[in-house]
Amino acid sequence: MLILKRIFIIRNFIFPFSNCRYASTVPSPRSGISNTNDFFKRIGRDTAEKVNGKFESWDGLFRKSTKTMKKEGIDVRTRKYIASQRNRFKEGFIVKPYPVMVKKNGGERRKRK
């Protein structure tokens, strides 16, 4: 019983914000990216047109969850792409567009033998 109490105390009082999304910091704009439109133009794949007006502020871009993006009508591929580029920007990597990969010969299930 004592062990369970210790685990409860450690989990709830020492690490209260470990699973909190809002505990993370919002990075400052850098390297020619001063607002959300510049960010979306830099990452490519026409994200600036797809999310037009859905991200008003810089904080909103980094605080908005993918569930909120889904409620606003952003499709799955775009949500995943924005989330991955957003995390790369937080980690300090250079933001650049990833090419859309094309399957060869219809994918691995239809692979030529």
UniProtKB/Swiss-Prot annotation:
Domain of life (superkingdom): Eukaryota
Protein name: Small ribosomal subunit protein mS41
Family annotation (InterPro entries): Ribosomal_mS41, SAM_Ribosomal_mS41
Native organism: Schizosaccharomyces pombe (strain 972 / ATCC 24843)
One GO CC term, this protein: mitochondrion
Gene that encodes the chain: fyv4
SMART domains reported in the protein's UniProt record: IGR
Subunit structure: Component of the mitochondrial small ribosomal subunit (mt-SSU). Mature yeast 74S mitochondrial ribosomes consist of a small (37S) and a large (54S) subunit. The 37S small subunit contains a 15S ribosomal RNA (15S mt-rRNA) and at least 32 different proteins. The 54S large subunit contains a 21S rRNA (21S mt-rRNA) and at least 45 different proteins.
GO BP terms: mitochondrial translation
Record: transit peptide: 1-22
Residues spanning the membrane: none
Family: Belongs to the mitochondrion-specific ribosomal protein mS41 family.
Protein's cellular compartments: Mitochondrion
Purpose: Component of the mitochondrial ribosome (mitoribosome), a dedicated translation machinery responsible for the synthesis of mitochondrial genome-encoded proteins, including at least some of the essential transmembrane subunits of the mitochondrial respiratory chain. The mitoribosomes are attached to the mitochondrial inner membrane and translation products are cotranslationally integrated into the membrane. mS41 is involved in telomere length regulation.
Keywords carried by this UniProt record: Mitochondrion, Ribonucleoprotein, Ribosomal protein, Transit peptide
Main location per the UniProt record: mitochondrion
Pfam families found in the cross-reference section: SAM_Ribosomal_mS41 (PF09597)
